[in-house]
């Protein structure tokens, strides 16, 4: 399963740096110039993987504990 990167707004659980999930109160920001994505303070929501509205990837249960 492929998980998408995250941007601000909405939910506070998102995938960051491959399989690392940003927890409560954090969001994932995309790295630039070859830098890795980072978890920072703020909420995040998954980006859709396709062009269909609302087509978001789910976060596995094991990450939500």
Swiss-Prot record:
Query: Which residues are reported to carry the modification Sulfotyrosine?
Result: 63
Ranges of Acidic residues composition bias in the record: 55-65
Q: Does the keyword Endoplasmic reticulum apply?
A: no
| Location of the region described as Disordered in the Swiss-Prot/TrEMBL record | 39-65
Pfam families of this UniProt entry?
A: Hirudin
Where is the stretch described as Interaction with thrombin active site?
Answer: 1-3
Q: Where in the cell is it found?
A: Secreted
Q: Which UniProt keywords apply?
A: Disulfide bond, Glycoprotein, Protease inhibitor, Secreted, Serine protease inhibitor, Sulfation
From the UniProt record, which GO molecular function terms apply?
serine-type endopeptidase inhibitor activity
Q: Which cysteines are joined by disulfide bonds?
A: 6-14, 16-28, 22-39
The answer, when asked if Glycoprotein is one of the entry's keywords, is yes
Question: Where do glycans attach?
Answer: 45
Please give the GO cellular component terms listed in this UniProt entry. Answer: extracellular region
UniProt xrefs under Gene3D superfamilies:
Thrombin Inhibitor (Hirudin), subunit I (2.70.10.10)
Q: Where is this region: Interaction with fibrinogen-binding exosite of thrombin?
A: 55-65
What does this protein do, in the record's words?
A: Hirudin is a potent thrombin-specific protease inhibitor. It forms a stable non-covalent complex with alpha-thrombin, thereby abolishing its ability to cleave fibrinogen.
By sequence similarity, the record places it as follows: Belongs to the protease inhibitor I14 (hirudin) family.
Designated name of the protein: Hirudin-3A
Its source organism is Hirudo medicinalis (Medicinal leech)
Organism phylogeny:
Eukaryota, Metazoa, Spiralia, Lophotrochozoa, Annelida
